[in-house]
């Protein structure tokens, strides 16, 4: 393919796409430049479908290269390792809008790789990668019902900004990413500072106008350089087999579905499956997989039919009903804060831990953020769904869910000045039947309040679903697992009483329009307010006192010029304070100093030691010092951490002293008076001028 270059203006910057320049052996490849950010996106597909699977094997990789920001990787190996959390979240951003646009039943392996080659701080590389993935797939022979476009939206001074720069992102009240086709919205992800539903909806629709321009631009590229799509050969089920299975199993599946409790319902469905397979195994011994597929289709149809025609859900709820909620705080005696949040059969334990500011997470990546003082981690063990599988650390889903819950609480976390602690939340999913990420949001709020963290407002979350059959649209509140699995949308909305703090929308149909979004957001608001009311019945506000097991923080402000003295040569002075008191000390360049101690007493002791260092030594002042070492001509005495002076042998006593050891020894605490400080800062001390006469006489 000959090299071709395409350009368009997007939100005040030039978007440049080069085709045929690099990676020509991939099915599709696009070199995309926006500002000074450059991303190479490739798409490849296997020639044959993968046998024996019932899912679409799509993988998306987002490769961060530190050379893109002029960095050399740290560590001994000096090369990029496993993907960072940011890279995993970016890969999910690329994956989610394109996944529903592949043909249903397509089983060929498809791999999309976005490699970040150059990063302009004013241009987010993940947005460029999302556009590039659409280009690479659209021009290739891989079956894909795109193209899609993607933009970020900020809100600064009441104005929406498309693809905001670094400074605008810092000021923005929202960070919204929207992807869609020319006709509909496909994916939404946002973090916001209590934004009203109407504003969020307007932002999404505003983004769609720019998405249409991007899609039109990509369609023009496809017309010029696109190749014909390969034929999708889908497996067809024998019609006679399907009719017989439907006649035998439909009513049985319907009855099995009408079970409120998840485990019992799954057991009933398993029994129906075994009964049907047993019934047809002699007639269709080689078609058991086809029978399973027909049973799945029947289950999906019946579940959706119950909702669209009967307006009732499998567990007996109406479309707007929320499952029973119960909460408990302070469930763990030794942690700093803990809570259990239960909604139906979804249950999450969230634990809050408070640490020193030195415990912040340092991020070595290509993004804006360099350190995190607040973090949320989400664990989804196999027992939560009654399964057995190896424990291999967090997967992409767990990282994504943890980040969503983290984003939901971020706007209400107090600032470092208000609450000088590092905050870590861990959500353990104890039982899962849909919407565990939003249960983690609720559990996080309760755990923070139990820990005494002065959050600005409580946050709750709810997951909305969608069943769309023709013109019949059914929006579901508080979806459970089967409704997520067999439905058309998973729309998670978290926020306070005032507004939205985080949203995440994924769909399985080609897109949804403004009216569906509006309905979902309004129902989510009502659901969120109800859930908040149930949470506040358990704990109305953050506790006034921290847990007795939480560390105590003492704040000080010191002269920045004194920081060097506090640290001492090679860190000697500060290390000594830490060793003697058992505290942690964090010092900022502007002179802010934080002492984190397990108890207030040791913290106050460290504070006194630091004050002694920062206080100027004055001639005529008397200090209690410690003898550090002895020489033939006198004793060196430390009168403050890192500050020592000489008591000459002639100044040890009013009487003549033959040997220094006759009066003091190493380790003695003695009173001394400062008699002189020379131009070099050397301190002269006198013992004989510091002690009362009677004490001197008693000593001798």
From Swiss-Prot:
Q: Which domain of life is it from?
A: Bacteria
Q: Where is the KH domain?
A: 551-610
UniProtKB keywords: Cytoplasm, Magnesium, Metal-binding, Nucleotidyltransferase, RNA-binding, Transferase
Q: Which reaction does it catalyse?
A: RNA(n+1) + phosphate = RNA(n) + a ribonucleoside 5'-diphosphate
Task: State its Enzyme Commission number(s).
Answer: 2.7.7.8
Q: Which residues bind Mg(2+)?
A: 484, 490
The molecule here is called Polyribonucleotide nucleotidyltransferase
Q: Native species of this protein?
A: Thermoanaerobacter pseudethanolicus (strain ATCC 33223 / 39E)
